[in-house]
């Protein structure tokens, strides 16, 4: 009897994967291995998802089913931020099965890939980002959420075997807006539907994500108090300037001129030097390397002191390691491999054709009570050397949220660890963690804005624990 059940299970899995293998979006494995000079035996899909009912908005996606037992593992949607930056950064630089060697166009296998424990879906969002296309015009946090839910529904309608599996959304940076707004759409979508027709959303894992109105909104941009506090605490600005900033922090919020602008400009100069100095400082990892790669037709931001302007005329964030992305994703052969349509523009890491993007001044903070009420677990992870969406801001709003919602502390602030490289050594400190009712705050020591890039092993450890709903030690 047990052998018969086992046989049926294997038959069921084989049938499901055979259905997938017939899908038109399946990437040619031999050609992928040839072009990328790798040896990957898993399935890869690349194509387009309908992001509106008319089908005029088409979002490019890549999907990596887990190579082993995919139907026994959860599905994770990964979104990068911007707004307007491609999620293929996540696939090829951070947590995909093969990633670029630092500063090169060469792939290497990622032993800490999230495909070890999950089925990974990457969607380029919103319109004009990466290979995605559609009607151009004003976009907003709200319209992006609508597009994303439509694309997600289309994905599960096509990959029906995965719809019943536990579903999680993860990402970083401005995905701190994308993820809660999409979760809100999923909650509304699921309302009144039978269990078989719902999206099985279980949790959100947001890295260095914009959340509070005081972080990434237009109102917060002129005087970035959380960034300035981060620089002050890390001795990147003088004590004299830091004290001046603290003295006026409340009156300078949202102020673009006068003494507030003078102080903001002083931070820029003390941290990065003047434009004449041409000092390249990496705000995404304050102790990290600053790469410079600007392909033809692209521009790199020269704003190094904090989060780049949302409407800045650039498609490459400062110091970003993008050589491999541009080398491959602008190749005609790779476009053919990934089944990229002629409607898709030349790929860029961040879109300069996004158009007018309207940022919600409320951020995504206002959605957290609804999400937690619907028993969707939240992991807020933060690299502690990121100056773009720094830990100072995250701890500010997490503390505020806990007090407002009276979230019980389940386990207090404490260190967490990863295994040592040598058996003779002790477990290694990976950061700090605090568990509240429905919400976990986790820091990653010496990681920047892109945690899975900077700390791959640590990312695998904490993500597996979150998926399994396990406490950290």
Residue positions per predicted region:
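Terminal and linker regions of secretory-pathway proteins
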Residues: 2-473
